[in-house]
């Protein structure tokens, strides 16, 4: 691994160890070993590769793996898929090698990711039913879509890692493909973040204006809700009914959409 400096290897190793400690509570030794194997291959094949902003590409994979395992709650096969999802496209690693060393399911995930990444999106609208059908017809495993969504979430969080032309296309992909899918999967926190990222990049002034107004009016909103809930709580208490009240402010994109 001549492409890394000693300091870079130390940074990567520290980040990976932190990640492994975080997932060792929910994954057994066999699953951790499976992830280690994929990470080692990625570390070797992405030898010294950098992102556009100058960061280490392997660190971006570790962050994506963390999103998968710790933010969404996905398991070892998805994490392995993340470490390997572009490896056949950018290195000499073949699908046969992936199948032999990681199993047929991971090979299908890697192949599926390559297929959806190779769709010529310049010739088809992201909003069209034709595109959605084409996209889904190429997928044999839902984890392919989840890895794509995780990768796009990473891109939205790290705009400087992506060139301007690609980022513009990724925004459309997030808006018309990723967000509807995560909504159907019930991943509402992820949906909220993706919607907010899209609005921040498309309508930054409007986003900040609504955010400011929410902050200014938050105390008044809380008083209003408490006044509304008080008679409901009293009625429930009188009937000795156990309950838990939840309420939330609508997301900024949702507020903007209704303006």
Describe each model-derived feature in a short phrase.
Residues 1-259:
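Active-site helical microenvironments for divalent-metal-assisted chemistry
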